[in-house]
Amino acid sequence: MTRLSALLLSTALCLPAHAQTPGIEKEELTLGFIKLTDMAPLAIAKEKGFFEDEGLSVTLVAQSNWKVLLDGVVSGELDGAHMLAGQPIAASIGYGTKAALVTPFSMDLNGNAITVSNAVWEEMKPNVPMADGKPVHPIKADALKPVIEAYADAGTPFNLGMVFPVSTHNYELRYWLAAGGINPGVYSPDDVSGQIGGEVLISVTPPPQMPATLEAGTILGYAVGEPWNQAAVAKGIGVPVITDADIWKNNPEKVFGLTAEFVDANPQTTLALTKALIRAAIWLDEGDNVNRAEAVEILARSEYVGADAAVIANSMTGTFEFEPGDKRPAPDFNVFFRYNATFPYYSDAVWTLTQMRRWGQIAEAKPDAWYDETAKSVYKPDIYKLAAEALIAEGKATADMFDFDADGYREPTSDFIDGVTYDGKAPNAYIDSLVIGLKGDQTVVGGEVTN
């Protein structure tokens, strides 16, 4: 047992009921976030007093983009932040920024979608099965493939946006395209555009700028979280064609990230933060999402997401609008606690690493053990379990809410749009089972894939 684990365990075992975490090393904290619906656990932990209950005084500060947010955490300007799941993983292996980051808490499942412009949607529609005058969902990228081919024949690039190179959005967009037989391109150490050999050109656009960039014609579609897909519908400029829950059911999305240095220096503060965030997640998913309407009003405020409440409510309250008049039930579009959403599973980290390898961000093949070791260096379920045990001891949660028997790996799943089975304990076999993308010992040299 590490010194940190021993210290946290002694604290958890000694906590009286209804007591804040004792021995807080740092009471005043500044946490960063991006203006997205899935920052909700942070806003709720603050507004419902869960941070305060733990003896924490928290200031939440919106960041302009994911790079600024990451730099803020690494520099210490921010004590922690709402992060893309891929950010602490990529930092740990030195892809982009090199830093030792960890996460004790997964912030949500699902929550993203892929939107295309109205013009592209009209070109896709003849290829989409219909029932009762409405598209049959999920819509596969097969329907987009002939559109992209027509653009290529005309010599016109097909530009798509995503929020960050190591974002779930990037990997979901690429997965969806590849499942439809479209090569999204690969990265190499010498070319980090991710466009080598691609039939589309995928680039970065900050989430709040997605609708305006689409409207300007700079991009023809994008993958992003809410409320920026529903905003395209509200503005009449685009059509979401698929949610990420239909690409991978109950996929991990954001995490709460901290530096390993912060956690080592502030173990009780880290425990307190994790407890408060778990309570916020429980509140968000309580009952049949009974608190979501209140959450929407909080998120709509300018200091948080700052979008129209009706737009945020489209996804947060159990529905999703694909086109005007085509609003469908989507009770699990945003999941904050159920299905063990907050548990930091190693297998979630491993999946991200497999996609980094698939698309060349990890330039060379790695053994299965490397994936396991890397995941365990970043994801910290031991802290999460201690926070959960403390909440149970305080009467703020019950044991049946948590997966205490988990070894850190979810069961293998085939809940992907292409039906391919993912087993986090066999990452190389999984990579090799995917038709498009690097596999085995393949590398990218001089813009060419070599064996």
Can you say where each PLM-predicted feature lies in the sequence?
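Gram-negative bacterial Sec-dependent N-terminal signal peptides
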Residues: 1-19
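Short, glycine-/small- and polar/acidic-enriched structural segments
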Residues: 20-205, 213-250, 402
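N-terminal hydrophobic or amphipathic helices and topogenic motifs
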Residues: 20-59, 141-159, 326-451
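Soluble non-cytosolic domains of exported or imported proteins
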Residues: 36, 63-67, 82, 163-168, ...
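Pocket-lining segment of extracytoplasmic ligand-binding domains
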Residues: 118, 207-320
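Short alpha-helical interface patches
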Residues: 118-127, 262, 381-389
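Repeat-unit-sized solenoid/scaffold elements
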Residues: 178-208, 236-254, 336-337, 343, ...
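Secondary-structure end/capping motifs
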Residues: 264-382
